[in-house]
Regions:
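Domain-terminus/edge residues, biased toward the C-terminal soluble/receptor-binding domains
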Residues: 148-152, 160-165, 169-384
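Sterically constrained small-residue positions within well-ordered secondary structures
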Residues: 15, 26-28, 232, 320-321
Length: 384
């Protein structure tokens, strides 16, 4: 049985009718060659400018380096490693590794993401994979897994040649994956810290300048220009912003993030535990069985977007039913496109009747007679 209802009017009681009405916000003009603003929870793209064009990405590459390393290490950064000569002396920004010194993987990891050490990138690659080329292969495989279809890596630090690139949309996908990894998310959100006598300061000024900023990564080369991936959270909503080749990246990120939070607020379509349907219940003293959403479903909605929900439940159900067991599904659509779904579970348990209803009728008739039944006669009448 499928029932299509107006999600906002019937289920969420947010506003009457079928259409969400909020104050309109106008998308800002940005100077970036490419830009993307993405909702972190759902992956919805809220703003895009030349989002699929492959471009040089400079040190934002290190988000993939960090993700692959964190996944390989299982988040354990406690191990101590001896710095090898071939890991040192890398051009550009540096952690200034010294051959023969011993450092923790945590120092290398945070040295990669905060001061953007190119030598730290090489060190992590070699510790994890044995050599840089193998690690870069892992990076490209992970990009493929994430659906980064306009991306190719040739090194772990972003110093690469014309064969090292990504699109703004792909970098937003990468940023979303990084936020879902606790080890990476914690590191990119760190403003500064001291590890093993090294003072590490994050290059991402938005951590100080933008309320709710949760970090990510800066980058710059002459070929790439200024590149930036940022994230921010407000009122339970996380946004990811990417700009490539943007001379005004700090201002553009602030404007895009403000726009996203204003124009696409996170809207709860169904709360976990909210009743979304009822069906006839057979074989029980109860007449109906209620089904509720197992998880909360939310989506960033813009002014004027129409929301509906399709509830799939059986036409009827036979007792017993058990609270929490799957009863059906609910699918949420925005302008006809599915944007979320959740299982429906039974809201409460209902046992099967232990007495036959016909037996109850027979017992009632007997009780109307001249002689009251014995206890044994009553039990016999009530047997199903």
């Amino acid at each position: 049985m499928r029932k299509q209802l107006a999600a906002l009017g019937v289920l969420c009681a947010l506003l009457p009718g079928l259409v969400l009405h909020t104050q309109a916000a106008e998308a800002p003009a940005v100077s970036a060659a490419s830009a993307v603003l993405m909702d972190g929870e759902t992956g919805r793209v809220l703003y895009a400018k030349d989002e699929n064009t492959p471009r040089a990405i400079a040190s934002t590459t290190k988000l993939m380096t960090a993700l692959v390393a964190a996944e390989y290490l299982g988040g354990d950064l406690s191990r101590q490693v001896e710095i090898q000569r071939e890991w040192t002396g890398i051009e550009g920004t540096s952690l200034y590794l010294v051959p023969g010194e011993t450092l923790s993987l945590k120092t290398l990891f945070y040295g990669l993401l905060l001061p953007s050490g190119n030598d730290a990138a090489v060190a992590l690659a070699c510790v994890c994979a044995g050599d840089v080329d193998t690690f870069v292969g892992w990076m490209n495989q992970r990009a493929q897994d994430l659906g980064m279809t306009h991306t190719h890596f040739s090194d772990p630090n972003g110093l690469g040649d014309e064969n090292h690139y990504a699109s703004a949309l792909d970098m937003a996908k990468l940023g979303r994956a990084c936020l879902q990894n606790p080890t990476v998310a914690e590191a990119v959100a760190t403003k500064s810290l001291t590890l093993e006598d090294r003072q590490l300061v994050n290059h991402n000024k938005l951590l100080w300048q933008y309320e709710g900023c949760t970090g990510m990564k800066t980058g710059y080369t002459r070929q790439a220009g200024r590149t930036l991936v940022s994230s921010a959270e407000r009122a339970g909503q996380t946004l990811i912003c990417v700009t490539l080749n943007d001379r005004n990246d700090w201002a553009d990120h602030k404007a895009l993030l403000d726009y996203g939070f204003s124009a696409y607020p996170r809207t709860v379509l169904a709360q976990a535990g909210e009743e979304l349907g009822r069906v006839p219940l057979e074989g029980s003293l109860l007449h109906m069985a209620a089904a509720e959403a197992r998880e909360t479903v939310a989506y960033p909605l813009q002014e004027g977007e129409r929301v509906t929900v399709q509830v799939d439940l059986p036409d009827a159900v036979q007792a017993p039913v058990v609270q929490g067991e799957i009863a059906g599904t609910a699918r949420f659509l925005v302008n006809g496109q599915v944007v979320g779904e959740t299982y429906l579970v039974w809201s409460s348990s209902a046992n099967r009747d232990v007495v036959d209803r016909k037996g109850l009728g027979d017992l009632w008739d007997f009780l109307q007679g001249e002689e009251a039944p014995t206890f044994a006669q009553a039990l016999e009448l009530l047997e199903p």
